[in-house]
Amino acid sequence: LQTRIGQVRRDLGLDSGCGNYEQLWITTSLRGLVGGVLSVEILEEGVHSGSASGIVPSSFRIARKLLNRLDDVDSGRVLAEVFHASIPPERVEQAKQAGSILGDTIWKQFPWVSCSHAPAGHEQACLSAQPTSTDPVEAILNRTWRPALSVTGAAALPSLDMAGNVLRPKTVLKLSMRIPPTVDAELASRELKQMLERDAPYQARVNFEADWAASGWHAPAMPAGLSALLNDLSLQTFAKPAAYMGEGGTIPFMNMLGRYFPEAQFLITGVLGPQSNAHGPNEFLDIAYAKALTRLVAGVVAQAQV
């Protein structure tokens, strides 16, 4: 395909996100992703918990101990520096600008549960569960330029109606770690496997089978002419200037395009904004914004020589 396309001058990607539905949002980076399945086995078969607990360690507790190697249980900060990267100053500045636009909507957009209890004297202040940071700039940087670990699935756990007084022989967890845009995913995946499998507690059988290793993407510097054009089109379309922000998701194709076409100008944008809930059960698009953004992108194509 590269030989058929030839030299690419401009690359438009339209499956990214937006901070709100009031202006053009230009994606400056995408996080990478490494992940896989962690299996912890301590017995050949399940046994009576009354007979075995206290002698046989819980496979779930061993899994917890292994996960503690990866991130801090209180803050969620990923511990190993191999998963971190320095944040370019211009991206910090853009995060500050985006934070000033979005304010606390950067974290209030998510469907938090209401508080079940609150410290004495703070009942009115505690209306919902809270994020890792309420500072908009830190929240943006946390989800765009810092690694984060999630457990996205589990196996070898019976359903509640089938669970009995049995000490289970194993625990299996599906792990997903988002990594900064400039971290090498293959290197991070190898390190993740080594961190989980070495020195297994109680000499348990521990195996991590990697299934994802996709590096992120960091946008090249945008030419002044293209930046001015995008700002003008945003003002014409939305009556507000263009804004810049990284995204926390992963589009492996972008990293590949960046490698194959290093001289190309990139405009990555999209309609996945507040409450759009990408990949969720009620994913939706703001139709009015999608139509407006389509007109704006048509303007970019019409002025392809800028």
Model-derived segments and their meaning:
Residues L1-Q130, L141-P147, Y260, N282-A290:
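Fold-level recognition of mixed alpha/beta catalytic cores in primary-metabolism enzymes, strongest
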Residues S39-E41, G46-H48, A63, W145, ...:
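Zn-dependent metallopeptidase/amidohydrolase metal-coordination segment
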Residues L43, N68-G76, E197, P201, ...:
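Generic secondary-structure signature for well-ordered alpha-helical cores
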Residues L79-Q94, P131-T134, L157, D211-A213, ...:
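A glycine-rich phosphate-binding loop feature that marks nucleotide/adenosyl-phosphate handling sites
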Residues E90-A98, W217-L226, N255-Y260:
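Short glycine/threonine-rich loop-to-helix capping motif typified by GTGT followed
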Residues S133, E138-P169, S176:
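A structural supersecondary motif
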Residues M177-P180, N207-P223:
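A short beta-alpha structural unit
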